[in-house]
Design a protein with these regions (language model features):
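Conserved catalytic core of Hanks-type protein kinase domains
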Residues: 42, 82, 111
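Structural motif corresponding to the early beta-alpha repeats
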Residues: 72-98
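N-terminal binding-site loop/beta-alpha segment at the start of enzyme catalytic domains
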Residues: 1-77, 115
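Generic beta-strand or strand-like secondary-structure segments
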Residues: 64-68, 82, 100-107
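Active-site beta-loop-alpha junctions enriched in small/polar residues
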Residues: 21-23, 53-55, 82-86, 122-125
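Glycine/proline-rich, positively charged
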Residues: 92-137
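Generic structural signal for helix capping and beta-alpha/helix-loop junctions
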Residues: 59, 86-89, 129
Length: 137
């Protein structure tokens, strides 16, 4: 696997990443055991940059991914998640406040069974007030 430096972060990430939206059943249903095994296979083959969001499957993707990550050494993967877009029971919500972003980070860490997140992205900024994102989120 080819790796590249990610800006000035000091992180070296693979040129391909593992997008975990499917773990939340976003595109179709998936057996949890197969979802977890797909994470193990990806990391084993060098796809160790994993991207997820609380919005994917309305928290399910992070929850399933967390079951896989607790079985892996923390240094074996780089993790990215998002703040700003949430939803449950088919209701989409956006909240770009600093307070909600901070709460979301801690909630994600709990679901993901980790003690830190390597990268945090702001999800779907086109629905936001950019001044709030820049100055608060």
């Amino acid at each position: 696997m080819e790796y590249r430096e990610l800006g000035k972060t000091g992180l070296k990430v693979p040129v391909l990443s593992y997008g975990a939206s499917s773990l939340g059943g976003v595109f179709h249903s998936i057996k949890e055991s197969e979802a977890i095994q797909s994470v193990f296979t990806a990391v084993e083959h060098g796809l160790n940059f994993i991207d997820v969001s609380p919005y994917y499957g309305h928290y399910k993707a992070e929850t399933v991914l967390g079951k896989a990550l607790k079985e892996l050494p923390r240094e074996s993967f780089i993790l990215s998640t998002k703040v700003g877009r949430y939803g449950k029971d088919g209701v989409n919500t956006w909240d770009y406040s600093g307070k909600r972003a901070q709460e979301s980070v801690y909630e994600s860490m709990e679901r993901l069974n980790i003690d830190h997140i390597d990268l945090i992205n702001v999800h779907d900024v086109e629905f936001s007030d950019m001044n709030q994102v820049v100055n608060e989120t």
